[in-house]
């Protein structure tokens, strides 16, 4: 007797084993699975700019790595007592600009080197909603508690994402033709605008990935979102906020991921 709907895993054209070098970019879900990979001593580099949730900020991280970018003080903003980067998570912020730059540049340098030997790039998107800095005219990875009036918030379309990533991944593939890209959508729900808006956001991400899969033969998809929605359809697999996935849920998805 089947007591749950089981999500079928489409095997990608590659295998992940101890010879595989991985880079993982995106939401906190990437950090959860990445922590498992690191624990079992896989060669893994996770989020050189910290946690990023939307597709354009993940693309920005990749652009920084491809360009071998080194940040200067001109790339930072002052917010109260802290120097911050709009491309980075708050863990890179510091009271002194030099300390902030040291954290950013040393981490980027490590990841630039790792990318050159990466076999599998894992990208997890969490939301299609983005914040664009009005004065700078660019989408940010983190608002760093600047006033809400500094930003314009809007939802990307599948076409927006497809256009950016078709160009970006084509350039990446041209430089590293043996690299494979594995997309996932984070099952963590973004509840700010309610249930319906969260589903619309996830749908945008899923449609964009499907378009990229059809267009680029080195792109694959791992259904972490579907596994949680169908196989783990129970709040005991969530943390107390009822939005994030519990350790037990992460363990379940990790077991599925290992079968790739």
Feature annotation, model-predicted:
Residues 1-260:
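Extracellular glycan-modifying ectodomains
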């Amino acid at each position: 007797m089947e007591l749950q709907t089981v999500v079928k895993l489409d095997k990608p054209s590659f295998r992940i084993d101890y010879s595989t070098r991985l880079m993982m970019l995106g939401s906190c879900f990437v950090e959860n699975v990445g922590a498992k990979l690191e624990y079992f001593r896989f060669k893994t580099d996770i989020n050189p700019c910290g946690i990023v949730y939307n597709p354009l900020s993940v693309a920005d991280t990749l652009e920084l790595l491809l360009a071998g970018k080194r940040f200067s003080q001109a790339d930072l903003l002052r917010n109260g007592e802290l120097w911050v980067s709009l491309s980075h998570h708050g863990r890179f912020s510091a009271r002194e600009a030099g300390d902030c730059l040291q954290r950013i540049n040393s981490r980027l340098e490590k990841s630039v080197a790792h990318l050159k030997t990466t076999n599998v790039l894992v990208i997890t998107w969490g939301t299609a909603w983005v914040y664009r800095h009005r004065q700078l005219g660019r989408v940010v990875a983190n608002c760093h508690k600047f006033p809400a009036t500094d930003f314009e918030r809007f939802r990307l379309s599948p076409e927006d994402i497809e256009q950016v990533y078709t160009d970006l991944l084509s350039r990446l593939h041209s430089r590293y033709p043996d690299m494979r890209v594995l997309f996932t959508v984070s099952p963590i729900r973004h509840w700010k605008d309610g249930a319906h808006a969260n589903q619309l956001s996830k749908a945008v991400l899923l449609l964009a990935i499907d378009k990229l899969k059809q267009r680029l033969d080195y792109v694959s998809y791992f259904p972490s979102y579907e596994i949680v929605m169908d196989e783990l359809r129970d709040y005991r697999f969530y943390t107390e906020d009822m939005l994030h996935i519990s350790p037990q849920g992460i363990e379940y998805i990790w077991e599925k991921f290992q079968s790739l």
